[in-house]
Amino acid sequence: MATHSTNEFRGGLKVMVDGDPCSIIDNEFVKPGKGQAFNRVKFRNLKTGRVLERTFKSGETLPAADVVEVEMQYSYNDGEFWHFMTSENYEQHAASKEAVAEAKQWLKEEALCMVTMWNGVPLSVEPPNFVELKITETEPGVRGDTATGGTKRAKLETGAVVRVPLFLNEGEIIKVDTRRGEYVSRAK
């Protein structure tokens, strides 16, 4: 099994810590004036979602996590699980509420997502960077309301709430950046 030394640690690297797959969020190399250098590492447990911090002596190694990033199509939510399907062999996988986490507000049927798999189980779901969603609820924008561009709250078809310009109305389809949760433009 492959291992990673502390000098290879970087954000996004997947390693095994205490038997669980983890993703490194932040790695800080510390060389004190006296004593051995060490790495202060912040990582997210991919099974539980908890963020932990630990220090490793310089030169220590951790086994690589055997996780796979697979592009899958979102099919449906049955109330308990979110179901995804691979494009190649149409294999179905059910992701738990913990695996979907914040991505659920951007998931629309047939959307392509990156799913992190470990031992055949979905651990995390990353929605596409941009999604096109319909505005289902917003206040009507009044012309002449502001001297400069103003915004209002709009509820989208997936339940997400974003700030949109005053000129947008219910029923319009907009493009949203899922990484920041912000309005980008009207859909073409």
Swiss-Prot record:
Transmembrane segments: none annotated. It is found in: Cytoplasm. SUPFAM superfamilies: Nucleic acid-binding proteins, Translation proteins SH3-like domain. Pfam families: EFP, EFP_N, Elong-fact-P_C. One of its GO terms (biological process) is peptide biosynthetic process. Pathway: Protein biosynthesis; polypeptide chain elongation. Its main location: cytoplasm. The keyword GTP-binding does not apply. The keyword Cytoplasm applies. One of its GO terms (molecular function) is translation elongation factor activity. Keywords: Cytoplasm, Elongation factor, Hydroxylation, Protein biosynthesis. The modification N6-(3,6-diaminohexanoyl)-5-hydroxylysine is found at K34. May be beta-lysylated on the epsilon-amino group of Lys-34 by the combined action of EpmA and EpmB, and then hydroxylated on the C5 position of the same residue by EpmC (if this protein is present). Lysylation is critical for the stimulatory effect of EF-P on peptide-bond formation. The lysylation moiety may extend toward the peptidyltransferase center and stabilize the terminal 3-CCA end of the tRNA. Hydroxylation of the C5 position on Lys-34 may allow additional potential stabilizing hydrogen-bond interactions with the P-tRNA. Belongs to the elongation factor P family. Involved in peptide bond synthesis. Alleviates ribosome stalling that occurs when 3 or more consecutive Pro residues or the sequence PPG is present in a protein, possibly by augmenting the peptidyl transferase activity of the ribosome. Modification of Lys-34 is required for alleviation. PANTHER family: ELONGATION FACTOR P, ELONGATION FACTOR P (EF-P) FAMILY PROTEIN. This is Elongation factor P. It comes from Coxiella burnetii (strain CbuK_Q154).
